[in-house]
Amino acid sequence: MQYICEKTKMSILVVGTVAFDAIETKHGKTDKIVGGAATYICHSASPFSKNIKLVSVVGDDFPKHEIIKLEKKGVDTLGLQIKKGEKTFFWSGKYHDDMNIRDTIETQLNVLERFVPHVPKSYRKSKFLMLGNLMPSVQQKVLDQMQERPELIILDTMNFWMDNFLENLLKSLKEVDILTINDEEARQLSGEDTLVKAAKKITKMGPKYLIIKKGEHGSMLFGEEKIFLTPAYPLERVIDPTAVSYTHLTLPTINWV
């Protein structure tokens, strides 16, 4: 296996939310912090590549210094749309003592409601494509704009899209290499009770590999009739689990080649 930390060659296109979060756990509460799938994917991938390209949208309320922070880590923000007079996507949630359980308090789509992704020409031959958790039609619009098929396409989704846009999601699944979802979503998408049966059915929908996220219990990788289990790193005190699944998207890319 070739190590792919060749920072000038490993081009990664990241598509997803750049957002604000307000989070409450038993350890404390925040009013508004920077969140979003694309934000954390970019930060977690930056030690391995200086050729990261971002496609997302924010309002003019998003702090400029956070964008500069990404750029200093090698993230190209040409594809980040900044909508004047509009507000950035906002999510608020509360985690239970069991942090696998959370309640959504408020969701403000704001700029995300009318987001039409534009992939700059310089992005369209990216070697790796990470499609964060977005409306399936938005993910498909990105796929349609690629000039060459990336070597690896990873897609993350959730039960809300399965409930409301299943047909669009199934279309996109035919074009991806890896799908990442949690165990509850795997059961819902497949209609199967056991994760092994669920994985077999889902990989027949298009993805060559399926990663099932299981929170504090780690994750499961299915593909090519094989199963690989990886544990979570044990921590004495977990402050905020929100971005864990986002950074998880980076791992398959780092280990792909």
Question: At which residue positions do the language-model features occur?
Answer:
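Conserved small/polar residues in nucleotide/adenosyl-binding loops
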Residues: 247-253
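A short acidic, amphipathic alpha-helical/loop segment
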Residues: 66, 138-145, 167-171
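Conserved phosphate/ATP/ADP-binding segment of small-molecule kinases
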Residues: 147-152, 160-229
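Positively charged, low-complexity intrinsically disordered leader regions
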Residues: 8-24
